A protein has these predicted regions:
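Short catalytic helix/loop segments, enriched in acidic residues and glycine
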Residues: 65-84, 277-278
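Short, solvent-exposed loop/turn and secondary-structure capping segments
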Residues: 54-58, 193-195, 348-352
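Non-catalytic propeptide/linker segments at domain boundaries
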Residues: 1-48, 52-61, 245, 252-273
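A short tyrosine-centered beta-strand micro-motif
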Residues: 178-184
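Active-site-proximal helix/loop segments of hydrolytic enzymes
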Residues: 80, 89-164, 170-173, 187-191, ...
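A solvent-exposed, charged loop/short amphipathic helix patch at secondary-structure junctions
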Residues: 55-73, 356-369
Length: 421
């Protein structure tokens, strides 16, 4: 990844490279990215978000300014612009805050015995429960430390290369027509396949994905955002099949449509806001992360926990990959992380631009990242990011300030085990 901005850089990944199947691949894309960011896995997040304060209840982390707050403003940069730009260049982008602004949420799961939205079809290999725990949405809200991905079961079937295959259909009843993010879940087993097949039917159109189930099991895995019709029919659903190119097993658990409302209870109350407006701490719990990822302060300081959760989620997913080989995790090959802040700042004249600041941390863990490469890779990345941004903004809009390149002790650049800024 870093070679993209500095060929031959001695601080970059060198011969460390992930060259196997990506976590998620859109097989229906009308073009194939052959260079750029193809199959690069990145972690990117917008700053802050609503959090629980023990004395003042649910509140924003940053003050109101220009009729908004940084907790809201940075989402309007990252979600509609930055993430799609990177995805269109071929990247697989993880973000530790909910990315979907849709307030509706529908979860279809095999553990909901009353639902007709979940159906299994056997055409050869049979579906059965696997030994691992899975997702179940058994309650309207969750207390601190409760993990919905430890409350249910997971289904599995032997994979087949034949056209004759079994499938599971997830067909929700949409109360409103609109755009909904689609998240799937599964479990990673020793014999999991690298290309489990999913088909998203949206307003009658079919978009096909392959998901590498050898990584990232036991959490929500984002496929894309699609337009769905109101109601319940086979033209608006998700199908998981046991078709794969290699021998092994396909697992399938719940499928989630829409970002939804916050459902993590703190101090006896949920936030009452869409999940996308909350901090990463609460999304991490809904996404099945262990308490050590988001609850380092044991429920006593959500503000500090939220700051650390963004990086800890990245490490939890990336642990065990070629880029973070020495820590346990989900083996997703995340190789770069970026936190975007607006700093809620302005010039004293209230008119001119304040400019760009980039931050990195090199003085930590003897100056090394988990893979053994130098933390100066983060400094190279931060400098290139700031310099290119200033150049682009100046060329497009006129003068744009170049502030500082800070090498300081900040959580979001200290904790990630990959180059970060």
């Amino acid at each position: 990844m870093l070679q993209a901005f500095d060929e031959g850089n001695s601080h970059a990944w060198g011969n460390i490279e992930y060259d196997e199947d990506p976590w998620v691949f859109n097989a229906s894309r009308p073009y194939f990215v052959t260079a750029g960011l193809q199959n690069r896995h990145l972690s990117l997040w917008a700053s802050h978000g609503r959090y629980w304060d023990a004395e003042r209840g649910w509140k924003w982390q940053r003050p109101n300014l220009f009729c908004t707050t940084e907790d809201l403003f940075t989402q309007t940069i990252v979600v509609p612009y930055l993430i799609p730009m990177l995805e269109n260049a071929g990247a697989i982008v993880f973000t530790p805050r909910e990315r979907d602004w849709q307030q509706q949420e529908i979860v279809v799961d095999n553990d909901d015995r009353r639902s007709i939205a979940y159906q299994e079809f056997v055409n050869g290999k049979k579906w059965k429960n696997c030994d691992s725990l899975g997702f179940a949405n058994l309650q309207a809200s969750y207390q601190d430390g409760e993990n919905p991905f430890q409350m249910g079961t997971v289904r599995q079937a032997k994979a087949t290369r034949r056209k004759k295959n079994s499938l599971v259909s997830y067909q929700p009843n949409f109360q409103k027509e609109g755009k909904y993010a689609v998240y799937v879940s599964y479990q990673t087993l020793p014999k999991s396949v690298p290309d489990a097949k999913y088909i998203v039917y949206h307003k009658g159109q079919a978009t096909e994905f392959t998901v590498n189930q050898r990584m990232g099991g036991g959490t929500w895995v984002y496929l894309g955002t699609f337009e769905f019709d109101k109601g319940c029919n086979e033209f608006n659903r998700v199908v998981c099949t046991n078709h794969a190119s290699r021998r092994g097993v396909v697992t399938t658990d719940a499928v989630r449509f829409g970002g939804g409302m916050g459902n993590i209870e703190r101090g006896g109350f949920v936030s009452g806001l869409p999940r996308c407006l909350e901090g990463a701490r609460y999304y991490a719990q809904w996404a099945g992360a262990p308490y050590s990822v988001y609850g380092g302060r044991k429920g006593k300081n959500d503000y500090a926990d939220d700051i650390n959760t963004r990086s800890m989620m990245t490490n939890w997913l990336g642990g065990g990959s070629v880029y973070m080989p020495a820590i346990d995790g989900k083996r997703v090959p995340i190789e770069l992380s970026l936190a975007l802040h607006s700093d809620a700042g302005y010039n004293p004249d209230g008119q001119s631009t304040w400019g760009a600041l980039a931050i990195c941390t090199t003085d930590f863990n003897d100056g090394m990242l988990n893979s053994g490469i130098s933390r100066f890779a983060s400094k190279d990345f931060a400098k290139a990011l700031r310099d290119n941004l200033v150049e682009d903004m100046t060329n497009t809009f006129g003068s744009f300030g170049k502030r500082y390149l800070w090498d300081r002790n900040y959580s979001e650049t200290r904790l990630p085990e990959v180059p970060s800024a």
